[in-house]
């Protein structure tokens, strides 16, 4: 139960391209209950949630945040196979966007205020980073927090000489005190601010602190998190986040001033429209609200920013390339064009990788040796007992084994 005397924290779940949801939820809180954000002790974030927490604390304009998210979606959808295309480098997109948009004193603004969830590669443990000494450190930490193994690349980036990957691998909804932390997630589950669905299905799972209801709606959302849909569909997540945050405020009696009740309309119905037809308990990513009056309660600022971000800024060449006959032809030519594009992308990445190639190769050698050693210990128990005896003998003579772990700069190849 909400206690107005407490200072609350907020935790934003990692969600890939679904970060639009966090934008809508935060805007609702800032308009309807600004004291929650103004007096917040800490902002926690993982992956896209960490990106949102940093941009919010830095007071980036809403229009700029929407522009960054929409540009990232457009880049991901600009190729035939989307985010899997070799020309799409999500690490570079995130790094370039952060370097361009974040203020130079971002490390001073967010230190002690924002906790970024990372997963340390060496032991798989979760690490919360909250102190930064430069803008580059903030960018490195955010790139590490967004690095999905294999999907984002083969070699993990580094932060302060240590390799890290997506914080969602170990803790996707980081909290220090669950009783005083408001959790925000775009997935159907049991978090404070998240989509709700009326259904007889009560099954849900908890994966690295992320609560997921077992429903087709979450399956679609998980797919959209890695393979974004059209910009209009992704933009609608802002409205979903805004309404879910409003429902949370209403249920806990936090709203400033009298507000119109939305409790009957904010819960997604058991049957939603898909292509004009009712489909069981399926809740698609495209929102299905039954009360048109809901839209009157939405923030004019959000509606304006979203409409502006969705506007088509493509030139005539892009419009021609998006014509159905041209797209069909491009798919037919894909078996021939993809190998050539892959070779070009590989050469380009190799050239940009050259400054870090020595450190990264050393790390790959160390990682390979660790994997081989663990496999050997699992397959040959005698080796495990012999290694234990050797360690005991070394400790007895005052020696402490310390495996060599070369560290390098961020790579993300």
Curated annotation (Swiss-Prot):
Q: Where along the sequence does the record place the motif called GXSXG?
A: 45-49
Q: What is its main location?
A: membrane
List all annotated glycosylation positions: 206, 209
One Gene Ontology cellular component = membrane
Query: Which segments show compositional bias classed as Basic residues?
Result: 394-403
SUPFAM superfamilies (UniProt xref) = FabD/lysophospholipase-like (SSF52151)
- Membrane-related topology note: Single-pass membrane protein
Q: Name one GO molecular function term.
A: triacylglycerol lipase activity
Tissue specificity is:
Restricted to adipose tissue. Expressed in inguinal and epididymal white adipose tissues and in interscapular brown adipose tissue. Also expressed in liver in response to high-sucrose diet.
Q: Which keywords belong to this entry?
A: Acyltransferase, Glycoprotein, Hydrolase, Lipid biosynthesis, Lipid droplet, Lipid metabolism, Membrane, Phospholipid biosynthesis, Phospholipid metabolism, Signal-anchor, Transferase, Transmembrane, Transmembrane helix
Q: Where is this region: Disordered?
A: 389-413
The catalytic activity of this protein is classed by the Enzyme Commission as 2.3.1.51, 3.1.1.4, 3.1.1.3
Summarize induction of expression. Up-regulated in response to high-sucrose diet.
Membrane-crossing residue ranges in chain numbering: 43-63
Which ranges does the record list as Cytoplasmic topological domains? Answer: 1-42
User: What GO biological process, any one, is recorded here?
Assistant: triglyceride biosynthetic process
In which residues does the motif DGA/G occur? 166-168
Q: Which residues form the PNPLA domain?
A: 10-179
Domain of life assignment: Eukaryota
Give compartment(s). Answer: Membrane; Lipid droplet
Query: What is known about what this protein does?
Result: Specifically catalyzes coenzyme A (CoA)-dependent acylation of 1-acyl-sn-glycerol 3-phosphate (2-lysophosphatidic acid/LPA) to generate phosphatidic acid (PA), an important metabolic intermediate and precursor for both triglycerides and glycerophospholipids. Does not esterify other lysophospholipids. Acyl donors are long chain (at least C16) fatty acyl-CoAs: arachidonoyl-CoA, linoleoyl-CoA, oleoyl-CoA and at a lesser extent palmitoyl-CoA.
The protein in question is named 1-acylglycerol-3-phosphate O-acyltransferase Pnpla3
């Amino acid at each position: 139960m909400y206690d107005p005397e407490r200072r609350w924290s907020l935790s934003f779940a990692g969600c890939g391209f679904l970060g639009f949801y966090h934008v809508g939820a935060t805007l609702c809180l800032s308009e309807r209950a600004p004291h929650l954000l103004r007096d917040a002790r800490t902002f926690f974030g993982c992956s896209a949630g960490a990106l949102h927490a940093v941009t919010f604390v830095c007071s980036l304009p809403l229009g700029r945040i929407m522009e960054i998210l929409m540009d990232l979606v457009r880049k991901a959808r600009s190729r035939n196979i989307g985010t899997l295309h070799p020309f799409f480098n999500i690490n570079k997109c995130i790094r370039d966007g952060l370097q361009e948009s974040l203020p130079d004193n971002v490390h001073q603004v967010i230190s002690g205020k924002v906790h970024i969830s990372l997963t340390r590669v060496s032991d798989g443990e979760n690490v919360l980073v909250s102190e930064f000494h430069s803008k580059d450190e903030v960018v490195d930490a955010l790139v590490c927090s967004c690095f999905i193994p294999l999907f984002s690349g083969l070699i993990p980036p580094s932060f302060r000489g240590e390799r890290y990957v997506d914080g969602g691998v170990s803790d996707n909804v980081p909290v220090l005190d669950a009783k005083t932390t408001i959790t925000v997630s775009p997935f159907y589950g049991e978090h404070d601010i998240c989509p709700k669905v009326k259904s007889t299905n009560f099954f849900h799972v908890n994966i690295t602190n992320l609560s997921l209801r077992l429903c087709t709606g979450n399956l679609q959302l998980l797919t959209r998190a890695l393979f974004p849909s059209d910009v209009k569909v992704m933009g609608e997540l802002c409205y979903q986040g805004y309404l879910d945050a409003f429902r949370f405020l209403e249920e806990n009696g936090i709203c400033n001033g009298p507000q119109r009740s939305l409790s009957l309309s904010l819960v997604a119905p058991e049957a939603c429209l898909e292509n004009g037809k009712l489909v069981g308990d399926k809740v698609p990513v495209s929102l299905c609200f039954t009360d048109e009056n809901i839209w009157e309660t939405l923030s004019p600022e959000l509606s304006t920013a979203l409409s502006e971000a969705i506007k088509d800024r493509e030139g005539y060449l892009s419009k021609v390339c998006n014509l159905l006959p041209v797209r069909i032809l491009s798919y037919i030519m894909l078996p021939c064009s993809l190998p050539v594009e892959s070779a070009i992308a590989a050469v380009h990445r190799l050239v940009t990788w050259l400054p870090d190639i020595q450190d990264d190769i050393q790390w790959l050698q160390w990682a390979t040796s660790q994997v081989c050693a663990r496999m050997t210990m699992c397959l040959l128990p005698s080796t495990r007992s012999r290694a234990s005896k050797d360690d005991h003998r070394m400790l007895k003579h005052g020696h402490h084994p310390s495996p060599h772990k070369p560290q390098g700069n961020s790579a993300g190849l």
